[in-house]
């Protein structure tokens, strides 16, 4: 999923696609994805 998100976000950020979109991906993954995975693992 990160690859898909990165591809979608990259053109939006122009000169710094990697840094900007990886920051967004990291934030959303930690807030959403990692939290959901934590719930699945603990459940």
UniProtKB/Swiss-Prot annotation:
Keywords: Capsid protein, Cytoplasmic inwards viral transport, Disulfide bond, Host cytoplasm, Host nucleus, Host-virus interaction, Late protein, Microtubular inwards viral transport, Ubl conjugation, Viral capsid assembly, Viral penetration into host cytoplasm, Viral penetration via lysis of host organellar membrane, Viral release from host cell, Virion, Virus entry into host cell
Keyword DNA-binding recorded: no
Induction of expression: Expressed in the late phase of the viral replicative cycle.
Site for Cleavage, residues: 33-34
Pfam families reported in the protein's UniProt record: MCPVI
GO CC field: host cell; host cell cytoplasm; host cell nucleus; viral capsid
Gene Ontology biological-process annotations: lysis of host organelle involved in viral entry into host cell; microtubule-dependent intracellular transport of viral material towards nucleus
Post-translational modification: Ubiquitinated by Nedd4 following partial capsid disassembly; which might play a role in intracellular virus movement during entry. Protease cofactor: Contains the major nuclear import and export signals. Proteolytically removed during virion maturation. The processing of the C-terminus turns the precursor into a mature viral structural protein and abrogates its ability to promote hexon import and act as a potential chaperone protein.
Domain notes: N-terminal amphipathic alpha-helix domain is essential for the membrane lytic activity.
Name of this protein: Pre-protein VI
Lineage: Viruses, Varidnaviria, Bamfordvirae, Preplasmiviricota, Tectiliviricetes
Keyword Ribonucleoprotein found: no
């Amino acid at each position: 999923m990160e690859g898909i998100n990165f591809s979608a976000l990259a053109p939006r950020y122009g000169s710094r696609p990697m840094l900007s979109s990886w920051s967004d991906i990291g934030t959303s993954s930690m807030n959403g994805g990692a939290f959901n995975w934590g719930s699945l693992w603990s459940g």
